[in-house]
Amino acid sequence: MKRMICLILALAMIVTLAACGGKEEETIVTTATEVSVETDAVVAPETTEAPTEEVTETTEAPNTVMPVEIVLLDNESCTFSVGPISVSEIAGMQVNVTCVNKTQESLDFSWNNVSVCGMMYDPNWAVTVPAGETLESKVEIDTYALETMGIYAVEEITFQLCVTSNENWMDAPYVKEYFTVYPTGRSADTVVYPVREAVASEVVLVDNENLTFIAEYAEQQDLYYVVRCYITNKTQGTLMTSWENVTVNGLDVDPFWTALVAPGKSAYAEVKFADSDLKAQGIEIVDNISFDLTAYDDADWTELVRVPVSYVPVDEAAVG
């Protein structure tokens, strides 16, 4: 009997030990799995690269010179307003404009015959506004380009606002009218126009009651022989100036040049002769340029100026 009891006790101990051994092995596996997961999530791969720093671009805050919006035109077909106007060293001057189309067709709004402080300057601005809609835009003025003309403060902007049908180009314009804006608060009596400094090599080609035309100098540039000119329109209308019947050293070479100058304004212009055209005529040095200097009223094409000119460049420059 005692032997039976001993056998039973021995079997019970073996079963207990086997059960304990199974639990320990399962715990180890579970623990190893947990350690593996935690290691993958926390430990980052080693790297020798330095941490990157965010590079932020510094932008200059524009200086608002005219903070208000001014309605220049408001009729049954459209409304046009300017402002605010801001200027910065990087972006130049930006004139905010608002165009309202009140018609049943698309309209083209544009600035033509633009001048800044009395000097012609073309910002190449035009927009199309769908029927019944309003469009906001910006007219950008390159202040660096103005500085080459002696303008260091934009005190006056004059432009002809043209509003025309985008669908029927032959129709009469809705608007074709001049406006003047004074961004810095000056007036027509107080605005300061730049004074042109005379150039030693300049030649006055025409100076009468309608027009002053000066050839400042001639020089060789990339691919072109260039005559830089200064023009003043003394009339009350827009002038279309041009060179006609042009010869260089007695040979036909046409630069196909024209320039529009608004009433009472001045302009710098470059008359360009292509090197290829000059070389085709065997011209290596420009000794003389002859032409008819003409000026027409842009409204009705009345000829106001026609003067035969023979221009001899002061500084010789080899073509090309």
Q: For each of these PLM feature ranges, what is it?
A:
Residues 99-104, 230-236:
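Asparagine-centered strand-capping/turn motif at beta-strand->loop junctions
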Residues 2-10, 14:
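Sec-dependent signal peptide recognition
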Residues 89-96, 221-228:
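Short, solvent-exposed loop/turn segments enriched in Ser/Thr/Gly
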Residues 23-78, 193, 199-206:
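N-terminal, intrinsically disordered, polar/charged segments of Gram-positive cell-envelope systems
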Residues 92, 119-179, 184-186, 224, ...:
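Short, solvent-exposed, Trp/other aromatic-anchored flexible loops in extracytoplasmic proteins
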Residues 16-19:
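C-terminal motif of bacterial Sec signal peptides marking the signal peptidase cleavage site
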Residues 54-70, 163-203, 315:
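A eukaryote-biased signal for short, well-structured alpha-helical docking elements
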Residues 105-112, 237-245, 284:
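Short, hydrophobic/aromatic beta-strand segments
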